[in-house]
Regions:
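Beta-strand elements of well-folded, non-transmembrane domains
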Residues: 1, 50-52, 63, 78, ...
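Hydrophobic pocket/interface hotspot
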Residues: 8-12, 18, 44-46, 61, ...
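Hydrophobic ligand-binding cavity/cleft-lining segments
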Residues: 1-39
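A short, structured loop/turn motif at beta-sheet edges
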Residues: 5-6, 37-38, 63-69, 87-96
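Beta-strand/loop substructures that line and gate deep hydrophobic ligand-binding cavities in soluble
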Residues: 71-124
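Glycine-rich portal/gate segments that line the openings of hydrophobic small-molecule binding cavities
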Residues: 29-76, 128-141
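Amphipathic, soluble alpha-helical interaction motifs
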Residues: 21, 100, 135-139
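Generic structural detector for well-ordered beta-strands
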Residues: 2, 29, 47, 60, ...
């Protein structure tokens, strides 16, 4: 992405920006009071709708390395396990943003039957995020 590290990391450091990069049909809504200071140990509560069902989700920022990476872990929510690592790396033509998600579905082994459907949904959500991030940073440049 053609932008500088400070601008990109500042964008991702503001929890309110999650609403800008989340598909509307997920009805993403942060419940924690603003402002939210992002740092290791920060807890964020929000509500999200998946497959027409609303879930409360509690996230812990378990790692915080400004302008390098941060990790959010689901403490409460629809997954048995959810660890999302956001990494940022300076490249010649801008910043490379990398998302890595490690997750496990609930109700093992029955939850695994939903894996193909969940995988498609996650791919669609992250494709949407990618396109929105590109649009937002094009507008800022």
């Amino acid at each position: 992405m053609p932008a500088n590290m400070r601008r990109v990391f500042d964008f991702f450091s503001n929890a309110q920006n999650l609403e800008l990069i989340t598909p509307k049909e997920l009805n993403f809504n942060i419940l924690s009071p603003f402002p939210i200071e992002m740092k290791e140990g920060t807890l964020i509560d929000y509500r999200i709708r998946l497959f027409g069902i609303s879930f409360n989700w509690k996230t812990l920022i378990s790692a915080w390395e400004p302008e390098r990476r941060f990790v959010d872990e689901q403490l409460k929510g629809p997954y048995a396990k959810w660890i999302h690592t956001h990494s940022f790396e300076t490249k010649e033509d801008g910043i490379m943003i990398k998302d890595e998600v490690c997750y496990r579905l609930p109700f093992f082994p029955f939850g695994e039957l939903m894996f193909p459907v969940i995988r498609l949904q996650l791919n669609r959500i992250f494709d949407y995020r990618t396109s929105r991030i590109k649009e937002i940073f094009q507008d800022l440049n």
